[in-house]
């Protein structure tokens, strides 16, 4: 299992200059590879990132000698990222989604570079972590604000510049010590903008709305930035101040989501959530800011990877299932609007619509889980017995590559 720990760095002035230079090399290599990919494709060729890496290696000593000032990993991993960007682009095209053609990178926007370690049996590694220091290629030992949390082999280090300084994201290959599956009960979770999460057992998690809380300050700093002369030192200071505020808002949101998803993944074995169409919901002009402030997509991402580590199962309910409109008592479907906060049914049930939806999500998740288990049981029962000789042949064929 690959786990990533992002840690703030305390580089010296010289190391900070090196980081900026390495980010520039990475950005240049990415833009060069993207332009070359487009040129070859328009000429009728079939470009690929491996060929582009070889092409750059052949010409960089003569045409780009300044690349030798930083680790060779910076341009190489940048070109790999171009290949990944096109993989995602073609995947979205096949799925009929908005493709999002890869774009050129600008200076000062998400500056980063990556250094990869070699194979596990290599005698030396480009990236090494000891206590609160990390050794990076061509840079030396850099101090970290905290020690690495995970034990295992460090596969790579991605150094990036945030609004408040430099960070390193360490990817660590750890042992697959997953928590044994236990029956900790099931829960349905309904997400919303007024109340972030409502559990089927009645527990609620209020929405922090960090962006709304800091909106006035964002407006004030944005107006101050607009009044500054372009290229001036005061404009750079105002821009950095605004960026730090945006980073703080994002961190407050992410921290709240981490606490919520950790609670769910550790306290329940079956978690039902809805397959929300977040991109479609963001088209609602009156609710777009509140929906973006809640972080629904980040909630699902965190919950799914944490559930794997705790042995829980996340069951995603179809987005068209009328969880809010269906009475959790008798199953009658009602026509209600977003203004209706209470569901009243002829059967006598009168309940908060979010709690009613969470109960329905839990019930639907358990039903889907039961169907899945029956299907797996039927599939295992239909498997024909295999001879000992056949098993020996299969052992040699099934080589794990993941």
What is each of the regions a protein language model found here?
Residues 1-402:
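Nucleic-acid substrate recognition interfaces
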């Amino acid at each position: 299992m690959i786990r990533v720990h992002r840690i703030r760095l305390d580089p010296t002035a010289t190391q900070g200059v090196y980081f900026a230079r390495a980010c520039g090399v990475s950005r240049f290599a990415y833009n060069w590879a993207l332009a070359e990919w487009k040129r070859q494709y328009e000429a009728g060729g079939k470009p690929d990132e491996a060929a582009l890496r070889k092409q750059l290696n052949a010409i960089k000593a003569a045409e780009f000698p300044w690349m030798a000032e930083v680790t060779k990993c910076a341009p190489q991993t940048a070109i790999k990222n171009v290949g990944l960007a096109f993989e995602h682009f073609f995947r979205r095209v096949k799925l009929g989604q908005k493709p999002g053609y890869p774009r050129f990178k600008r200076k000062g926007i998400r500056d980063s570079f990556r250094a990869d370690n070699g194979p596990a049996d290599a005698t030396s590694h480009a990236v090494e972590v000891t206590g609160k220091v990390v050794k990076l290629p061509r840079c030396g030992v850099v101090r970290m604000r905290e020690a690495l949390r995970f034990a295992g082999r460090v596969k790579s280090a991605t150094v990036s510049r945030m609004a408040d300084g430099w960070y390193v994201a360490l990817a660590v290959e750890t042992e697959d010590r997953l928590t044994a599956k236990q029956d900790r009960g099931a829960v349905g979770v309904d997400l919303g903008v007024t109340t972030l999460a409502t559990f089927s057992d009645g527990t609620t998690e209020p929405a922090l709305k960090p962006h709304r809380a800091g909106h006035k300050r964002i407006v004030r700093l944005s107006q101050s930035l607009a009044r500054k002369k372009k290229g001036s030192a005061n404009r750079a200071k105002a821009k950095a101040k605004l960026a730090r505020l945006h980073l703080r808002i994002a961190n407050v949101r992410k921290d709240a989501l981490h606490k919520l998803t950790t609670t769910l993944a550790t306290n329940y074995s079956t978690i039902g959530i809805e397959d929300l169409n977040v991109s479609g919901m963001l088209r609602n002009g009156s609710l777009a800011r509140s929906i973006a402030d809640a972080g629904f997509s980040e909630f699902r991402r965190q919950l799914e990877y944490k559930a794997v580590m705790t042995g829980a199962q996340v069951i995603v309910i179809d987005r068209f299932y009328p969880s809010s409109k269906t009475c959790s008592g008798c199953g009658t479907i009602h026509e209600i609007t977003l203004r209706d906060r209470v569901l009243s049914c002829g059967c006598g049930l009168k309940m908060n619509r979010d709690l009613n939806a969470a109960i329905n999500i839990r019930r639907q998740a358990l039903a889907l889980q039961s169907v899945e288990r029956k299907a797996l049981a039927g599939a295992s029962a239909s498997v024909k017995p295999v001879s000992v000789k056949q098993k020996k042949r299969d052992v040699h064929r099934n080589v794990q590559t993941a």
